[in-house]
């Protein structure tokens, strides 16, 4: 699918609710800090949109008011972004949304069969498995961004069909998966895969930074999305901190490949993401 046609993972209301949940305001605190009445806050949290109310609320939630309103008014989408040669994205349904998984290989590697690595599995690995066969790719590893069900659902089938090894960060606990400490670097052909801890949404979330393709590529799972980020299920503060330090500090041209929603770049998220 054309990246410009992939809808954003989160609406403005999703962003606001993630911030409210993450900050755990005591009763009445949000009203007193924002200067908004309980009635007005109730309207906002039920999806009633007024730009001036969002501008009043955003700073209290640590959100950028202009970026939040741009999201609410439909003024932000990453638009047309293409994947570089050597990476493929697969999109599969999961309940009422979709989840992405990825294959990466060295496009400059010679030989009939090239090594490849997968990142997550999605809900159905059939298309990925067919792609491996049609493109003469030999799957060596399946790297997991985190262990949530929509990202690992078809892991057993991929391992059975390809005999690949599955790996994840050492704070996750997916049965049968080898563990590594983030900071470790892997190689496939001439490509380098650097692992970075981006926990907060999951306790062992990992971002994989791939160097050696046409541009740097960060496969981030649910750490960050175009215009949003994964909810702080484990730690909201850690989500914000690790996204800033491990993803948004990367070169501006770095392609961000998320688990949901459209592709984006470090430059675009530094300009448009309301959380940062």
What are the language-model segments listed below?
Residues 52-67:
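DNA major-groove recognition helix of helix-turn-helix/homeodomain DNA-binding modules
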Residues 26-31, 57:
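Short alpha-helical "recognition helix" segments of helix-turn-helix
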Residues 1-23:
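A short, Lys/Arg-rich alpha-helix, primarily the initiator
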Residues 35-49:
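Recognition helix of helix-turn-helix/homeodomain-like DNA-binding domains
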Residues 113-116, 124-192:
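Active-site HxH/HxHxD metal-binding segment of metal-dependent hydrolases
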Residues 2, 113, 203-276:
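Metallo-beta-lactamase
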Residues 79-134, 208-221, 227:
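Conserved beta-strand hairpin/beta-sheet module of binuclear metal-dependent hydrolase folds
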Residues 103, 185-213, 249:
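Core dinuclear metal-dependent hydrolase active-site scaffold
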